[in-house]
Amino acid sequence: MRIAFFGLPLAALLLAHDGHSIVYAAACRAGLGFRRLRSRVAPGRTTLRPDVTDPGVIDAVRAASPELIVSWFWTTKLPEPILAIAPGIGVHPSLLPRHRGPDPYFWAIDCGDETTGVTAHRLDASYDTGAVLARRPLPLDPSWDAWRLARALDRPSLALLREVVRAYADGQAPSSTPQDERAATAAPELGDDDLAIRWSWSAQRIERRVLAAAPWPGAWTEIGGRIVTLLRVRPTEDFPRALDPAEAAVRKDGIAVVRAGRGAVELLAGRSDDDQAPLSTEDLAQLVEASRRS
C-alpha cells in the first residue's frame, strides 16, 4: 500500500518491512532511523519536521499519490488539505476518548487509571477525536512512572498500527465507531506551577503526581528554600504525628518523611533544580535535616 507517513521513523521502517511503499515521509526526529528511512523513500520525499501547513509540503504529499496517510507520534495537527488527499489513521497511547491530547501518560497515572492502552483511530480536523478503529487495553502497574508506561505501550502501539494498515491494504478496513463525547477527557501539557506538589493532598495522590511527572519534567517542592524535583516517593503511616502537612522530619532509619493531608510520604529519589544533580534518599534526608536546623 502507498503510504504518506508522519511521525517517528521506526513505524515507517516497520511498515516498509511489511511490504508497504512509503511514498512520502515526514519525520519528527533525526538520527539513524531517519537516515534509514530516507534510503527507502524516493529522493526529495523525506523531510525532517516540515511545516505541514506549507503549500509546498501539501503539494509534495499530493504528488506522491498515497492511498493512506499514517500518523504515529507526529506532534502537530495535520491540516485538512492533507487529510483530504487520502484516508488518514493514527494511534494514540490511551483508550480514547479518555485522555485526548499531548500528555496521556501523565494523566493516566495521575488519575489513578487501572487500565490504559492504545487506540487506532481515523484522523480528522481535531486532535484525537476521530472514529475508533481498534483498541488494545493494558493493565497499568501502579509502580510505573511515565517513562515506564510509555515503553510498555510502544510495542502494542506498533503492533496495532501494522495490523490496521494491513487490513486497509487487504481491502478490509476495520469498521469505525464514533467516540463517545460524554466519556471524553483531556490530557493537556502542564505548566510549571501545575507540577508543584500540594501537601494538602493524600499521600497516594502525591505519589501518583510524582510518578506521572517522572522522570521529566518532574513534580517539585521546596525544601529549606531549595527547589527539589521528586522522582520517587512512597506513602507511609510511619511518621511523627506532631507534623503538620508540608512539614518534614527524618526518621530513625534515616529516611525523610513529609506529612501530607492524609498520611505521609517517604522521600526516596529526586533531582536538584540548581544543577540537575541526582539526589539519593540520603541526600534528601540531609536537606530535610539542614532545613530543620535553619
Residue ranges of each PLM-predicted region?
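One-carbon transfer enzymes
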Residues: M1-P217, T221, R226, P235, ...
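Short, solvent-exposed secondary-structure boundary/capping segments
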Residues: D238-P245
